[in-house]
Each structure stands twice: as structure tokens, then as C-alpha cells.
A protein has these predicted regions:
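Surface-exposed loop and turn segments in beta-propeller and other repeat-based domains
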Residues: 172-189, 230-235
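Histidine-rich, glycine-flanked metal-binding segment
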Residues: 263-304
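A flexible loop/linker signature enriched in serine peptidases of the S9 family
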Residues: 1-4, 10-23, 27, 36-43, ...
Length: 513
């Protein structure tokens, strides 16, 4: 965050050993200095109008992040100069300050998880700096973010992945109902294809967000003028970083080599030459080994191509914290998985982890993902599709964030699913889908041009008509045998017939439940 006088930038930096640290650096550049505050997992940094007090949310421990220093999670105030911390409340997330000096935050009003719930609403609450006198300020059904402007005159919120601006000020004792489709007061859509990381400038005169690497800002005065059109472009904040590439030359010798050539040959005493990040040659023991290659004798071992887990669900991080060491990624890698694809994830986490892995900052397989699903059910994931432009907006948003595939997930009508497929075709990304345990939906998706079907078709047998139809479409099939429709899962099989907990690689990398 920027200090209100624009002279300083404050930010959070994570390390697995030190956890979250608040740093401050001069806006003109220079060496960043860490505040002296208690250790913890902190996220969602904010600053008040005076510039003297910060707010953060402290997380409890989790299966992915360090479980230590997790006592009393919730909202905290931090003195900018001293680093002294004061607990405020266990309620709320995304803290920010209003014009009255009170602390504002959002929380879920319903207990639903957000998958398929028509009552998944979010409320904006305010409280004193001691955590007392909690008041409900605004409510928005299916919203993921609600943030009051620092001057208190407008509210920005994200609904259906789009950024909206409501021209209204809260009143004591009254809950404002924010509704982008049937507003009770002037409400404008600010984003063209959607966005994340909602923020206000210091005086509340402009609201900003990002769509992938593009940072976009709209002055409130411009938005309120007749004929306003959401901005097409923004400021590109991307930077070029060298991809990790080893400079080693290795010759793996005397190994049993499983190949992927046209004949699927198995070479009993084979040699594999590795140069940098490429396989230079594969052959039998007669393959010449050039000078400069370090030989590794793998007698009695088998070398196989890296496995691709095409349906692998994280985790990659939590609340924008990406750990430097992720047991899930390490376990995949140890078991020979060199590429994973996640068909339902969170863009801010999965693509951050993917870029870190590609740059060599974290160790793990190559990571690809659809990020958030294009979801047809009413939830905080809800992605409404009524027109082709709606579908294009969702696909472009995900593509801008890093997606090479999108998840066409349970849009209820066939024409809606067709729009997502057409939008994907136009944008050059691959649509995958889940038929929701419905045989006829799977068949419709294949006929409409889906790239791949996730999860098994829920029938005991598929006959030749379906096999011919499916094969000619060239649509992929990922049955995800550990999660199945209409039958037992293979996960249960392994629990029944093997002692899973004794597997040496699982025992080494996967923590106990």
C-alpha cells in the first residue's frame, strides 16, 4: 500500500522461516526496512488516512503453511513506526479504514461454502478500533469483495467477477443492499472483463483493480458521467524474469528405459543424454556419449518419461501467501509427476506458484490451470453467461491471468455452454468441462466441441456408438478414478488393499492428516 503522502510504500514479504514481515521502502527506491513486530502469517495490508496505523489479517496455521505463531487469528492494528500490534477482532477479512476512523471488513453472511448455494452473500461490517460496536454496513449477494471508499461516499464491490461502483454512502443503523442487476441507487460496472485486487486511492476519488498484469484505474467523476465506458487497457505491470534452466550435461547409463517413440520401445540397457532442460538423445548402450557429459550409472533402475497429472487440485498457497516449500508439489515430483494441470483453482495462487516454479523460486512440477471455474450455479464463484460477450469476458479475464484452459462448469443451459466453447475458440484457449454426473450433458459437450471431459461418464458400459462418436470428436477424457460417479473410487481400493501410510515417498513428503 502507498502511504497517504505518497512518499512510502509498505508491503508484506513472506519466508517459510520468518513468516510474514511488513516492510517499508521510499517511493523513490532504496533499501526496504522490516518493521519489528511479532511473527505470524499476515495478509491483506491496509493503511489509515493519517498514515500512522496499519491493519492486517492474521491467519491460523494450516496443513500447508507453518502451524506455529498461529494463536488468536483475526484483524490487527499495527503502528507504522514502532511495529506494535493490537488485536482488534476475530471477525472479518480484507480490513480497511473509513472516514470516521473505524475499521471496516467483510465477512460471509451465510454458512454455505460457495458451491451451489443461492444464499452465499457477503456483508461489509464496521467496528471501533478496539473491536467493539460492530455494525453491518452493506450486503451483496454472491459478492467476493466489498470496500468502502476512504471518504465514505461510494462503495466498490466485485460480483460475478466484475467490478462495480455504487454511488451511495452508509447510514447509521441501515444496511445497504448492493445489487448490480437491480440497484436501488446508481450502480455502474467499471470493468470490461472483470478483475481482482480491488483498491481505492487515498482520498476516495478513484477506484482501481487488476486484470492479470494490467492495472486499471477509473476516477469516480469519470465513471459518473453519462456515456461512461469501462477502460479497454491499463498499465502493464508485468516484468521479464529468466526461466530456470540447468546448465548440466548428464548421461544416464545402464538403465531400463521406457520410451515414448512410435513403437513404445523398452530398452533394457539404455542411455539417456540430458543437456540443460532438454533430452538430447535416447538409445541403447551403443549410444555415443559426448565429452563433457557426467555419467550416472543406473543399473537396476528404470527411467520413465515424466507423468502428467491432468486433474490435480493444489494446494498452492493461502490468502496470497505462496510457501517456498510445498509438500504437495514435492510429493507429486517425487512420484514422477513433472507436469500438473488444475481444472479448478484460484488464479492469484495457482498462477503465482506456476511462475515461481518456472523461475526456479520454488521446487515442483510445471503448473497449468483453468483458475476459477466458469460456474453456472449461484455462488461466489458464479460466472453469469447470457450472451457471447459475457462468455468472452470470462475467458479473456482468465486468459489475462495466465490460463491456457478454462473450465466450462455446469452452466445450466446448452446454449450457455456453447457460448463458453465459442469464446474459448476465439481466444485460443482449451475448454474442459464436467458433465455433473449427467450422461446426456457429457454427450452434448462432446458434440459442441469441448476439448476434454473431466470425471467419468456415469454409466456402467459405453457401447460402440458412443466410442465412435467420442473418438471422432478427438475430445479428451480424464476419468479421475480417485473421484468417480456411480461407483467406488480407486482411493478406497488402495485403503482397502494396501498400507498406504507405509509408502516411503508418501510418508516422507505428505504430512499426516
Amino acid at each position: 500500500v502507498w502511504s497517504p503522502d505518497s512518499r512510502e510504500i509498505l508491503f508484506l514479504r513472506w519466508s517459510d522461516s520468518e513468516l510474514s514481515r511488513i516492510h517499508r521502502v521510499a517511493a523513490r527506491g532504496g533499501k526496504a526496512r522490516a518493521l519489528d513486530h511479532p511473527k505470524g502469517q499476515y495478509t491483506e495490508l491496509a493503511i489509515d488516512r493519517s498514515g500512522e496505523t496499519l491493519a492486517v489479517r492474521k491467519l491460523a496455521g494450516s496443513a500447508l503453511l507453518n502451524p506455529e505463531w498461529s494463536v488468536q487469528p483475526g484483524l490487527y492494528l499495527v503502528e507504522r513506526k514502532s511495529g506494535d500490534m493490537q488485536f482488534v477482532s476475530a471477525r472479518g477479512e480484507h480490513p480497511h479504514f473509513g472516514p470516521d476512523g473505524r475499521l471496516y471488513a467483510q465477512e460471509r453472511a451465510e454458512s454455505a461454502s460457495g458451491r451451489g448455494s443461492s444464499t452465499a452473500s457477503t456483508v461489509l461490517i464496521s467496528m471501533s478500533r478496539s473491536g467493539h460496536d460492530v455494525q453491518q454496513v452493506a450486503s451483496a449477494e454472491l459478492a467476493t469483495r466489498i470496500q468502502l471508499a476512504p471518504d465514505g461516499q461510494h462503495i466498490a464491490f466485485i460480483n460475478g467477477h466484475q467490478v462495480h461502483l455504487a454511488a451511495t454512502a452508509p447510514s447509521a443503523g441501515e444496511t445497504l443492499i448492493l445489487d448490480a442487476t437491480k440497484p436501488a441507487f446508481p450502480t455502474l460496472r467499471l470493468s470490461r472483463v472483470g478483475g481482482e485486487y480491488l483498491a481505492w486511492n487515498a482520498d476516495g476519488s478513484a477506484v482501481s483493480w487488476s486484470t492479470g498484469a494490467e492495472f486499471k484505474t477509473v476516477p469516480v467523476a469519470d465513471a459518473m458521467r453519462p456515456g461512461f465506458s469501462p477502460p479497454q487497457n491499463g498499465t502493464n505491470l508485468s516484468m521479464r524474469v529468466a526461466a530456470a534452466r540447468p546448465d548440466t550435461r548428464l548421461a544416464l547409463t545402464n538403465a531400463r528405459v521406457i520410451t515414448l517413440n512410435a513403437q513404445r520401445d523398452v530398452i533394457d540397457s539404455g542411455t539417456v543424454l540430458l543437456e540443460g532442460n532438454r533430452i538430447r538423445a535416447v538409445g541403447d548402450s551403443s549410444l555415443a556419449i559426448p565429452d563433457g557429459f557426467h555419467q550416472v550409472d543406473l543399473e537396476g533402475k528404470t527411467v520413465v518419461p515424466g507423468f502428467v497429472d491432468i486433474h490435480a487440485h493444489g494446494p498452492y498457497g493461502r490468502a496470497d501467501i505462496i510457501p517456498q516449500q510445498n509438500w504437495d508439489l514435492l510429493a507429486h515430483l517425487a512420484l514422477g509427476v513433472t507436469t500438473v494441470h488444475n481444472p479448478s483453482s484460484q488464479a492469484s495462487l495457482v498462477f503465482a506458484a506456476a511462475e515461481y516454479a518456472r523461475a526456479g523460486r520454488i521446487l515442483g512440477p510445471r503448473i497449468f490451470s483453468t483458475a476459477e471455474i466458469i460456474y453456472g450455479a449461484k455462488s461466489t464463484y458464479y460466472a453469469p453467461v447470457e450472451t457471447l460477450d459475457d462468455a468472452l469476458a470470462h475467458v479473456r479475464r482468465l486468459k489475462a491471468q495466465g490460463a491456457v484452459t478454462v473450465k466450462n462448469y455446469n452452466q445450466p443451459r446448452r446454449d450457455q455452454r456453447q457460448m463458453v466453447i465459442e469464446a474459448s475458440r476465439r481466444e485460443g484457449v482449451m475448454p474442459v468441462a464436467e458433465g455433473g454426473a449427467l450422461y446426456h450433458m457429457d454427450m452434448n459437450l462432446i458434440g459442441d466441441g469441448i476439448t476434454g471431459v473431466e470425471h467419468n461418464v456415469p454409466t456402467l458400459r459405453l457401447y460402440d456408438d458412443v466410442l465412435q462418436y467420442w473418438c471422432q470428436s478427438e475430445a479428451g477424457y480424464t476419468p479421475t478414478l480417485v473421484v468417480t460417479f456411480g461407483g467406488l473410487t480407486s482411493e478406497d481400493y488402495y485403503y482397502q488393499d494396501t498400507e498406504v501410510w507405509k509408502h516411503p515417498l508418501l510418508a516422507n513428503f505428505v504430512p499426516p492428516a
